[in-house]
Amino acid sequence: KTKPVYIAGIIALIGGWLLLHGTVIDDIIFPLGMSFYTFQAISYLTDVYWQEQRSERNWVDFLIYMLFFMKFLSGPIERGGDLLPQLKDPRPFIYSNAVTGLKYILLGLIKKLLIANQISPQTDVMFHSIHDLSGVQLLMTCLLYPIELYADFSGYTDIAIGGAYMFGIKLSPNFNR
């Protein structure tokens, strides 16, 4: 009856243990999103604990919520009360959703490929030779790196939101500004 709560707890405990005990698995699991799953599970457990949502009774629906492929690696972290009902409700194909989804995906690709990926080599070089940089170069590094981070994560999020939107699923925006 409460299997999803136990599953979420196990995911959160495994993620926390791996984070604290750094193992060889770090090279495999964390890049595959274990930290994301840990936060997702903690979010779910918190909502259930504070009774902001009821515990999901169907463990298959819960696993679909936890493993929803559009937010698999990059988020956004969704509240169970927002995403679970959408995943349970069959949705017909709607052309306008597909177009809107493709626009989000295109925007995400622009952010990721044309902004983040172009800035990244520059900031990498600067960070590897930080002691040899002039004041202007340090200032440029401080200005460019947040732009790179924003474009990278925001781009991935836009791609995930767009892909989900094409299926009629509305994910929460991570970056409103």
Give, region by region, the residue ranges found by the protein language model.
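Membrane-embedded transmembrane alpha-helical bundles that form the catalytic cores
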Residues: 1-177
